[in-house]
């Protein structure tokens, strides 16, 4: 069953910026573009304007996600990914980018695609304080407790989680 697209009011802060758009059918995120050119040296970050502001319907929020190609090819990440755009916010959407590449600078030109905007329905909740939470299969297991990566497993004391290779990596000269 296909639903009708949600109408979201949008104002161009920069009259020349292309509207956010989905690159392919079925994409979850619409591409956001920067309205300013910028060069980031290794380790630098910047707040880039997108030239758009939105009015989301009550009960919705938008989330600014990184573009995987920028991460894979250039080492660009979003500092607060995902960034949250609340329904009541009317200011320009801005994206906080950081260059994580240790050697190469990255350059953004005006209207380069820098992030994706995902609009989702969100629930408001009422928090109810209790003395004890009900049991669950996971209990208090967190941060690597489910394994799935070579660096996440039993440490030398047989405890699950943690990074048993951290001391090996940090003891290498020059690292």
UniProtKB/Swiss-Prot annotation:
Catalysis: reaction(s): dUTP + H2O = dUMP + diphosphate + H(+)
E.C. number: 3.6.1.23
InterPro entries (UniProt xref): dUTPase, dUTPase-like, dUTPase-like_sf, dUTPase_trimeric
Residues reported in the UniProt entry to bind substrate: 67-69, 80, 84-86, 94
A Gene Ontology biological process term: dUTP catabolic process
Top enzyme category: hydrolase
Region annotation (Disordered) ranges: 138-175
Pfam families assigned: dUTPase
Transmembrane segments: none
Pathway recorded for this protein: Pyrimidine metabolism; dUMP biosynthesis; dUMP from dCTP (dUTP route): step 2/2
Keyword line: Hydrolase, Magnesium, Metal-binding, Nucleotide metabolism
GO molecular function, one term: dUTP diphosphatase activity
Co-factor requirement: Mg(2+)
Function description: This enzyme is involved in nucleotide metabolism: it produces dUMP, the immediate precursor of thymidine nucleotides and it decreases the intracellular concentration of dUTP so that uracil cannot be incorporated into DNA.
Family listed: Belongs to the dUTPase family.
Protein's UniProt name: Deoxyuridine 5'-triphosphate nucleotidohydrolase
Organism: Streptomyces avermitilis (strain ATCC 31267 / DSM 46492 / JCM 5070 / NBRC 14893 / NCIMB 12804 / NRRL 8165 / MA-4680)
